[in-house]
Amino acid sequence: KSDGENTTSNNVAVFDANKVLTDTRTRNENELSDSNSIQYSINYTNRLNATGKKLTIDLQYSKSDQDQASSIFQNNVFVENNNTIQNSVRKLFQIDYVYPKEDGSQIELGYRANLDKSNSDYKNIPLVPYSDPKFDPSNNLDFEQNVYALYAQYGKKYDKLSYLLGLRTELTDQKIELLTTNENYNKSYIGLFPTVNLGYEFNDTESITFGYSKRLRRPRSYFLNPFESRSSETNIFKGNVGLDPTYT
């Protein structure tokens, strides 16, 4: 459990077309936050025999809740209240099998499932009307993302030369529900991620390694939320539900 208090200040200077200062504004935000989190983990390891065969199973469950309340003042005038309630549940299941062979090589096989679910409920209460009467940043977002991965790798060492070859396939199933507007967005995609490592030992203190791998970075729910959020009149952020993952 953790509690916190934070104050931020944003200063805006407005100039006309001739670069003459016409107005200044100061926006102060006082934020109070309260969060709770809990996590449970279970690990099972079975060394199947003396040759190094091993089976490992991991289970994990975590839950977190956060409540943030903000009071915003502009030029020392109380203009709005914001309240954000966020909660998330994460589940993990992973199984790995290691099989060393008599020729010195080793095979590893595994499966991993990450199941994430979260909700973000943001309420905005303006005390001074916005210049745009249609603007309402209040929103409620459900986000669910399940990632299932199968992977295998094979490695061997010949005297001073060693290599490792691996391949992982991932299925991502993503669901976004905008409860405020009753909109739903679903996306599923599969990716293949190879890994190649080559190593050579010159002596006991010097070696060289070449490696290649492919990785995936998925956008967080914050960057997918299409509702506007403003830290000032001129600083506006809006997510995009159509964002694709990036590969490196």
Describe every region a protein language model picked out.
Residues 1-3, 29-177:
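Face-selective signature of the C-terminal outer-membrane beta-barrel domain
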Residues 139-146, 216-248:
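Outer-membrane beta-barrel signature, preferentially recognizing the C-terminal barrel domain
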